[in-house]
From Swiss-Prot:
Part of the ribosomal stalk of the 50S ribosomal subunit. Interacts with L10 and the large rRNA to form the base of the stalk. L10 forms an elongated spine to which L12 dimers bind in a sequential fashion forming a multimeric L10(L12)X complex. The gene is rplK. Belongs to the universal ribosomal protein uL11 family. The keyword RNA-binding applies. This is Large ribosomal subunit protein uL11. One of its GO terms (biological process) is translation. GO terms for cellular component: cytosolic large ribosomal subunit. Forms part of the ribosomal stalk which helps the ribosome interact with GTP-bound translation factors. It comes from the Bacteria. Signal peptide: none annotated. Gene3D superfamilies: Ribosomal protein L11, C-terminal domain, Ribosomal protein L11/L12, N-terminal domain. It comes from Magnetococcus marinus (strain ATCC BAA-1437 / JCM 17883 / MC-1). One or more lysine residues are methylated. GO terms for molecular function: large ribosomal subunit rRNA binding; structural constituent of ribosome. Keywords: Methylation, Ribonucleoprotein, Ribosomal protein, RNA-binding, rRNA-binding.
Amino acid sequence: MAKKITAYIKLQCPAGAAKPSPPVGPALGQHGLNIMEFCKAFNAQTANMEPASPVPVLISVYADRTFSFELKTPPASYFLKKAAGLQGGSKAPNRDPAVGKVTWAQVEEIAKAKMVDLNANDIEAAKKIIAGSANSMGLEVV
């Protein structure tokens, strides 16, 4: 029989740098999970990713206090900021002038990387989703 899932935990940790300090420690500790076991497993799975890139993770907590986790791709905003060479997006998007520019080729590259996590059937729909994220950040797609 399958294990009974008691909770789901959503976290965002830097690749290869999960530590038992907040936010990881308290989130896992309140469910009685072994924090160091998660940190070691997460760091091992993200060792080949770009260091310090934010990696969303969905942790399934089982009744016997064991867990499994699923890694997602980094957020679109992370890829867009990297492509535009910015530290952050606009404070008032669509009112202030664009803070940066990304090309459609860059948008397509980001869409291909994010395709597994996006709710899109084809690359064109994924490109529109990423372009919308860029617009919300105050970036101009050229």
